[in-house]
């Protein structure tokens, strides 16, 4: 549970812009690259974990990673302007003259050594973030926006906010795997979670590798395992093939199968909490199913989009 939000006037450092440099790039799996950033300002980057939302401020359209330029929209003013201020300035710039923004969750933060890891899933065809990561080299510059530890509010940019809940449904596609991994690692002793992963290549599963899972898990098949603290039932829903007469693909079909088995309990038992993350359209459809058809209260569902099919997801 996050610390209470301070009054607005006491929040000059809840959110900051961090100039960073690429320190290392490592391929984790067929479609994941880990980019390690360093920068003196990262000593103040808050290591809140979970599904902490950050922005990568990418190069201007047409610029190579090593030619990074930041458009004039006030992002590096001190203290960093409120997001609504600099974002409005950014939106007023012509599209070809403003830096591309993309949402991520840190894989790891190490403020003491001024480092931050971001695991980038490489989409095909490559969008701006994927193209940047594939071309990036140590020494390239970037700006990251995220939480500033000097404020002390541990809830900024975090959607995962369970209170007294200890039964969880966690649904994620590859873009949300770093956040899902953080969340699973945070589960308290005695918690139980159903973890549904939407995936194209099982080798890209960065989440269940930390669990005691033996062998592969077929589409819509499940296996039960334990973390040091919690019991996790894992379902890997492979993308690309339909899994039933309703033509639903991958994790959306898996969620409906889960709903048929557990939906009534999740609706009636206030201990249940749901977290959905990935492609914006899919998370919206799943949330609508959970609330409209299963009747789960909206205040027990957190959902966020990391990307959108067919267009940019910013803001």
Question: Which functions belong to the PLM regions below?
Answer:
Residues 1-315:
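Extended, composition-driven regions rather than compact fold-specific motifs
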């Amino acid at each position: 549970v996050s610390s209470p939000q301070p009054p607005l006037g006491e929040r000059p450092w809840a959110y900051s812009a961090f100039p960073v440099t690429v320190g290392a790039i490592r391929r984790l799996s067929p479609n994941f690259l880990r980019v390690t950033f360093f920068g003196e300002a990262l000593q103040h980057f808050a290591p809140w974990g979970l599904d902490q939302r950050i922005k990568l401020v990418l190069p201007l359209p047409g610029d190579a990673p090593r030619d990074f330029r930041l458009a004039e929209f006030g992002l590096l003013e001190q203290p960093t302007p409120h997001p609504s201020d600099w974002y409005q300035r950014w939106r007023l710039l012509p599209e070809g003259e403003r830096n591309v923004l993309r949402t991520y969750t840190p894989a790891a933060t190490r403020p003491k050594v001024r480092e931050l890891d971001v695991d980038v899933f490489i989409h095909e065809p490559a969008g701006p973030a994927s193209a940047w990561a594939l071309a990036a080299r140590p020494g390239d510059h970037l700006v990251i926006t995220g939480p500033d530890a000097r404020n002390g509010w541990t809830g900024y940019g975090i959607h995962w906010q369970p209170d007294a809940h200890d039964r969880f449904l966690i649904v994620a596609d590859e873009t949300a795997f770093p956040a899902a991994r953080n969340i699973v690692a945070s589960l308290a002793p005695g918690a139980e979670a159903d973890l549904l992963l939407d995936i194209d290549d099982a080798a890209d599963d960065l989440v269940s590798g930390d669990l005691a899972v033996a062998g592969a898990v077929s589409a819509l098949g499940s296996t039960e395992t334990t973390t040091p603290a919690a019991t996790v039932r894992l379902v890997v829903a492979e993308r690309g093939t339909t899994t039933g007469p309703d033509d639903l693909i991958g994790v959306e079909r898996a969620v409906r199968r889960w709903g048929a088995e557990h939906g009534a309990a999740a609706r009636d038992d206030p201990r249940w909490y749901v977290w959905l993350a990935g492609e914006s359209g899919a998370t919206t459809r799943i949330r609508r199913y959970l609330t409209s058809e299963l009747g789960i209260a909206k205040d027990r569902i957190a959902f966020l989009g990391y990307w959108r099919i067919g267009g940019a997801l910013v803001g």
